[in-house]
Amino acid sequence: MADANAMEGEKSIPTKIPHWRQVTDPGAVTPEIINYPYPGSGTEADPYLVQWIPSDPRNPMNYSAVKKWSITFVVAIATLAVALISSAYTGGAIEIAQEFHADAEVITLGVSLFVLGFAIGPLIWAPMSELFGRQLLFFGTYLALTAFNAGAAGSPNMATLLVLRFFAGSFGSSPLTNAGGVIADMFPASHRGLAMGIFAIAPFLGPVLGPVIGGFLGESAGWRWVEGFLAIFSGVVWIIGSIFLPETYPPVLLRKRAQRLSKLTGKVYASRMDIEQGKLSIGQAFKTALMRPWILLFREPIVLLLSTYMAIVYGTLYMLFSAFPVVYQQHRGWSPGIGGLAFLGVLGGILAAMVINLLDNKRYAKVSKEYNGFAPPEERLPVAIIGGIAIPIGLFWFAWTNGPQIHWIVSIIASAPFGFGMVLVFLSLMNYLIDAYTIYAASVLAANSVLRSLFGAAFPLFTRYMYQNLGIHWASTIPAFLALACVPFPFLFYIYGANIRKRCKFAGEADAFMQKLMQANSAHLESDLEVSEAGPIPRRNSLEAREVLDRIQSARSGLTRTRTAATVEYEGNPYDIDRVNTGLSRVSTTNSQTR
C-alpha cells in the first residue's frame, strides 16, 4: 500500500509554495508534504522520518533556473560587497590621518583589522549556519555589517573607527563562508561550475574595485562619505537579500518541516538526518569548527604548504593597498582617485584568469569522465602551475618598472600577470585541497581561510616601513621572491602528490574513503544491471551505495569551485563543518534524501 501511495505521489505535481512564503516560513508545507507516506509509525520510539518528497517544491535543487541564478547573483554581490568594503577605506586614508592626527601605520590598521575579522567566518559563522540555517545568519550578520559601517562614518576618534572596522569585518565575513554553501544547496556538482565561478571571483574583484570607488569618493566628498556609502551599499544588499534569499540549507529545512508536521498532525516526526546521525549540538559544532582546522593545518604538510602559498599571494594583494599609494601618489603625485585606477591592471588579469578557468573546467570535465567521475586530485593542478609562474613574473616586472622615470602604464600592465596568476592559483589549489581531503574539506578550507586572513591582515602593516627603508624597487621585489620560492609547489604535488597523500593521515583516510566510493559505484552499476534483467527488486545495499556516490560527487564540485568540498555534516557541501566518519556505513546513513 505504501508503495502504491509512493508511486501515486511521484505522478502527482506538488502544490507550489510562493516565494514570499518560502522566505518568511521555512517550515511551510503543502497537502502533498503532509500526506506523504514517510517511513516510521509516528511514535516517540519510531517517529516518521522526514525527507524530501518527489518533486518537492521546497527542495532547493528543484528551484527554477531563474530562481537559482537570481539567488546566485545576490550571494555573489553580497560577497563582493564585503571584499570591496575591506579596501575602499583606503580612499579616505589621507583625510582620516589629517583629522585624527594618526600615523600611516595606525591608518593601515583599518584595513588589517577588517581583514583579520575574515578569520572569524569559518570558525564562528560556519557552525552557526549549521545550527540555525543560512537565511537567519545572513539577515543578522549583514544587518550588523551595515550598522558597523554606519557607525564608522560617524566615528569621533581613531580608536572607535578601528574597533568598528574590526567588527564590520567579523560580521561581514559571513557571506565568504556561507554564500558558497547556498550555491551548493541549489546546484548538483555537475552544474555547479559556472555558479561557483561567479561566486569565486567576488573576493578578488571586491578588493580591486574598492580603491577605485573609495579614492574618487574620498577626494570629492570626504572619508566619512566613503564609510557612509559603504553603509548604504551594504544596507541595500541586506534589503535585497532579505527579500530574495529563502532558507536553502536542507537539514534546517527538514528539521523545521518535521516540527510543523508534528504540530499539525499530533504525530511524532523527525528529520531523517537528526535521527540517523544525531542532532548536532552547539558544543559539537564549535568543537569541530574551532579545533580540526588547526589539527589539519599543522599535521598535514599538504595543507600547510599550499595554504602558506595561498596566504602569501593573498597577503601580497592586500600589501598592494599600501604599496600603490606610495608608488603612484607619493612618487608620481597622483590623487587618491586616480591612484585607485592603478588597480585596473590587476582587474584585467583577474578577468583573463576567469576565462582560462572556464576553459580549464571543460578540460577537467573530460578528464573526470575518463576516470568515471573519480579523477585524481592532481588533475586540478595544471592551471596552478601556469598561475604560479605568472605571479613572480608580474611582481618582478612591477618592482623594476614602478619608478617615476618609467611611464606609468608599464608598471600597471605589469600588475596584470599578478592578478591573472593569483586567481588561477587560488581556484586550482582550492579545488585540489577539496578533492584531496573530501570528507575533511570544510576543515581544510577553514584552516586555509584563517591563515590567509592572518597574512592579509599582517602584510599591510609592514609595507610602508619596507618601502621607506628599502625603496620602491627592492621593497616590491621581496614578495616576488616569496612567490618565486613557491613556484615548485604545484609541480611537486602534480608529480608526487598521490604518494604524498598516502603518507598523510587525513589525506590517506580521504583517499581510502574515495576508494570505497569507487567500489560502491561499481556495486551500484552491477545492481542496476541485475535490476534491469530481473525487475525492480529492492536492494538496500545498492541504494546506500548510490546515495553515498551522489553525496561525494556533490562534494567534488569545482568552482567547480574552489569548492569546496566535503564538509560539514557530510552532505558533500564543502562549506559545512565536518562531522562525519570515514566509514562507508556511517556516511551512507546520511543519505541524499536529506538534500
Swiss-Prot record:
The keyword Nucleotide-binding does not apply. GO terms for cellular component: plasma membrane. Keywords: Cell membrane, Glycoprotein, Membrane, Transmembrane, Transmembrane helix, Transport. Coiled coil: none annotated. Pfam families: MFS_1. SUPFAM superfamilies: MFS general substrate transporter. Its main location: membrane. PROSITE patterns: MFS (PS50850). It is found in: Cell membrane. Gene3D superfamilies: MFS general substrate transporter like domains (1.20.1250.20). GO terms for molecular function: transmembrane transporter activity. Induction: Is slightly over-expressed in strain TIMM20092, and azole-resistant strain isolated in Switzerland. The chain crosses the membrane at residues 69-89, 106-126, 136-156, 166-186, 197-217, 225-245, 301-321, 336-356, 381-401, 409-429, 442-462, 478-498. It is a multi-pass membrane protein. Glycans are attached at residue 62. MFS-type efflux pump involved in the modulation susceptibility to fluconazole and voriconazole, 2 azoles with similar molecular structure. This is MFS-type efflux pump MFS2. The gene is MFS2.
